[in-house]
Amino acid sequence: MKRIEVNVSRVIPASPAEVFEVWLDTKSPGGPWFGCERVILHAVVDGLFYHSGRHQGRVWAHYGRFVRLERPRLIEHTWMSEATRGIESTVTVTLEPKGQDTLLTLCHSDLPDDDLGRQHEEGWKFITGAIADRFGSRRRAG
């Protein structure tokens, strides 16, 4: 099966350290694990994660293993779900300072080249948007 790569970039109004912490905190509003029905996350190299959440009227389970954690600039983990056809893919998140903000760049590689694989782009745009909104509301209030 042919593979594709999805890339999403977004400027987040927070420091790389703040974004890194939110990415790995299951209880942090705006983070990728927040609001899931069930989350198990052991955020260390070779640590595993599982999360399930509702989307389009059904539950989707996701599994993976943390490959690299370089605080506060890089998070890399594998990603497997029904939407990857059970094949392990890789998510790499880089966090670069951009003035007082952070440029978050996400690369999701080895996705199947089909509708489910391509839908990951919209999912990651939603998640990175939620993180930006979380910090954007804080900055507006502060």
Q: Which residues are covered by each model-predicted region?
A:
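N-terminal short leaders/motifs
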Residues: M1-V6, A17-E21, V44-V59
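Residues that scaffold the ATP/ADP-binding catalytic core of kinase and kinase-like folds
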Residues: V22, P32, S52, T78, ...
